[in-house]
Structures are given as structure tokens and as C-alpha cells.
A protein has these predicted regions:
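Glycine-rich phosphate/pyrophosphate-binding beta-alpha loops
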Residues: 73, 77, 125-139, 203
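Glycine-rich, charged/polar anion/phosphate-binding loops
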Residues: 52-55, 98-99, 107-113, 130-138, ...
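A generic structural signal for short beta-strands and their flanking turns/coil linkers
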Residues: 108-110, 120-122, 144-149, 183-185
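Single conserved hydrophobic/aromatic residue that forms the stacking wall/gate
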Residues: 1-11
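Short acidic/glycine-rich loop or secondary-structure boundary segments that cap or lie
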Residues: 77-80, 120, 131-135, 158-161
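ATP/nucleoside-binding phosphotransfer catalytic cores, i.e., glycine-rich phosphate-binding loops
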Residues: 116-118, 142, 152-228
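Gly/Ser/Thr-rich active-site loops/lids in small-molecule metabolic enzymes
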Residues: 88-95, 136-160
């Protein structure tokens, strides 16, 4: 079950606090909130302090908006998901994504657009939070900062990856030539032909456009008094 799929109903009942248990997509998101796992996490999901958190929205080819918690993107990162088998995902968790990613990291950049401007990118990501397992995509990003965090990853082959991986693993905020990040309220990612798109790690139908924005404070989530 992907947590983001159930957020539409929660969003319609604004004002009702949401408790999160750390499994699947919720596990990645809960780490950004500093939520514990196990019994402590279950107790916090029932009794934690309600705090306002942002919610991401994405529209593919002008279709109905879909909510997300962690990140969405167009390009090679979404293609990686084609190689993630469900049985491996259940058995290995996020390691299954890393394993599949090794098969796409060496592929060349794609012709894409950001807000109508032509670019070449391995992928373009838009995130609501900053951290994923083993790395920080958007250092300093918080789930309640009211901002959309965008990454243009312009690697083109294996050699370009090493400084990018080092930047992610050291949680560095410094951008490099192949890695550009910025904050905004809205971004439109486009392509002349349908490209792979993912939403919180779930592969979606290939699309020519991916419009993304943040709804600040849209969710009430039970947390600790402060976010780590």
C-alpha cells in the first residue's frame, strides 16, 4: 500500500490528525519527521502532537492532481522503477531500488524542459522532504517549510556520478556542475515524447508533462513536539 494513494481522502477531511506507521512510503516520510518505529511509533501515531505539514501535488498531462509526500520526477530515475520487481521490493526494501538503479546510472541524458526552457537531464525531481535512505536529496528541506524543492540532475554516464553521490552521502548543500537544486512554489517538467514518471516511488503512466506544486500546511500529522 502506498500512503500517498490514501491522502486524497485525508485531505478532504482537513483538521483530522493523521497518525503514520513507518512502513513502505511512510517509512521514508516518517524518517524526515523523526518518527520512531515499532511500538513507540505506534503510540506516537495515536497520541502525538498534531502539527501542520505540507502536501505535494502532481498533475500528469493536465490530468487530475495526485498527492505525494516524498518526491516525484520524470526521467531515468522513474525508468529505474521498471526494473524493481515486487518480490524484491518486499524482501529488500529500498535496497531493491539501489540494485535496479545500477542498470540505469550509465544511461545518457534526456531532452526535457523545465518551465518551458529546454534542458538535458538524467532526471528532474521535485520533492516535499529532503532525505531518502543513504542520502540527502535536498539538504535543509523540511516537511513544513512551505516550499517545493527541485533538482536538475545532468549526469551523462558513470564518470559524472561520483561527485554527485559524494554530495548526497555527505548531505552537502553545495551544488556542482551536474547537480542543480533550488526552491520554488511550482514547477512544470516537460518532454516532446512521453517519459517515465514516478510518484513517491510508484511508477505512473508515461507523460509529456508533469506539473508539481506544494500545498503548505495541508495535513495535520501526529509527531513529536519538534522535528529532528
Amino acid at each position: 500500500f502506498c500512503l500517498s494513494r490514501g491522502l486524497g481522502d485525508v485531505y478532504k477531511r482537513q483538521g483530522v490528525p493523521l497518525g503514520i506507521l513507518a512502513t513502505g512510503t511512510a517509512c521514508v516520510y516518517s524518517r524526515n519527521l523523526g518518527l520512531p518505529r515499532g511500538l513507540a511509533g505506534a503510540a506516537l501515531a495515536m497520541t502525538g502532537v498534531p502539527r501542520s505539514m505540507d502536501l505535494g501535488w502532481a498533475s500528469l498531462d493536465g490530468g487530475s492532481p495526485e498527492p505525494f509526500l516524498v518526491a516525484t520526477g520524470m526521467g531515468r530515475d522513474a525508468e529505474t522503477l521498471l526494473g524493481v520487481r515486487n518480490n524484491l521490493k518486499k524482501r529488500l526494501g529500498w535496497v531493491a531500488y539501489v540494485r535496479a538503479g545500477l542498470g540505469t546510472m550509465g544511461r545518457h541524458r534526456l531532452p526535457l524542459r523545465i518551465n518551458g526552457q529546454p534542458i538535458e537531464a538524467w532526471t528532474v525531481l521535485a520533492g516535499n522532504v529532503g532525505r531518502v535512505p543513504t542520502a540527502s536529496l535536498f539538504p535543509g528541506a523540511r516537511p513544513d517549510d512551505g516550499r517545493l524543492h527541485v533538482m536538475h540532475l545532468g549526469v551523462d554516464g558513470w564518470r559524472d556520478w561520483w561527485p554527485v553521490l559524494l554530495t548526497g552521502m555527505t548531505h552537502s548543500r553545495r551544488d556542482i556542475g551536474k547537480l542543480l537544486r533550488w526552491e520554488t512554489a511550482h514547477v512544470l517538467i516537460g518532454s516532446d515524447i512521453p517519459r517515465a514518471v514516478h510518484l513517491d516511488g510508484d511508477l505512473r503512466t508515461a507523460a509529456r508533462s508533469l506539473e508539481v506544486w506544494i500545498d503548505p500546511g495541508a495535513l495535520l500529522i501526529r509527531c513529536r513536539g519538534s522535528i529532528n
